[in-house]
Amino acid sequence: MSFGIITGILGSVVGLVILAYCFKNAIKFKNNWYQKKMIKQNIISIIHSSNSSLLSLAGDNTIGLTTHIEFIKSYDKLNKDKDIHIILHTTGGALSSAEAICNCIANHTGVGKIIAYIPYYSYSGGCMIALACDSIVMTKNAILGPCDAQKSNFTTQYSIASVIDTVNYKKQNNEKIKEEWLANSYDAILCKDRQRKYVEKLIQCGHFTQDIGDKIYEEFFSGKYNHDKIFSSADSINLGINVQIVDEMPELIKNITSDI
């Protein structure tokens, strides 16, 4: 191969690297600009969409540690005496991270209310976050999904309820139980208890009445449905959740979610 060809290839590679670097920084600049704009408008977004040029708080694909940390950073900069707007468009993620965000919302002591906006969907951990807010604004076609925690291995995902039920069934029928399943069932029991206590916390702080809180736990957290079960805005209202149904999102929210 001639020196000229090698030089040409190296030049192309360097050009691509520079182009990628510039693109990455352009996205970062745009995100920073959006974040500053949203802070001024008392908005936090948790948006996980491959179609969106506006990445979530830090570019996570699901709710994770980075989302949690960036949420807290954004929350600390907001005006607590005005209503805080949280835009949710996510399939969920890590329970611990979603729970940490929920605790931040539950511990809010400012005069302003915390309002969740769901233009399309908010599943699992995203639904948990919505339920922690003072009210939820949804379009008539927007949906929520169950919040029951999931266990997974390399090939399959299980609800914690199914892990517990499977182990109990095997015990009752004197069937051999793999050590892995025993360990998972113990972890699942602790996780289920943790989610029950989370709902009780929302009840005790006056977020829900005991009756409504029990219904919410049964429908969203108990694992009685498949994890892909959907709850419409009307279903949510029927459960006693403070949901406002709108034909379209407020202009302030639409400006941010237009590219989802």
Task: Give the role of each language-model region.
Residues 1-117, 121, 137-139, 150-260:
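N-terminal organellar transit peptides
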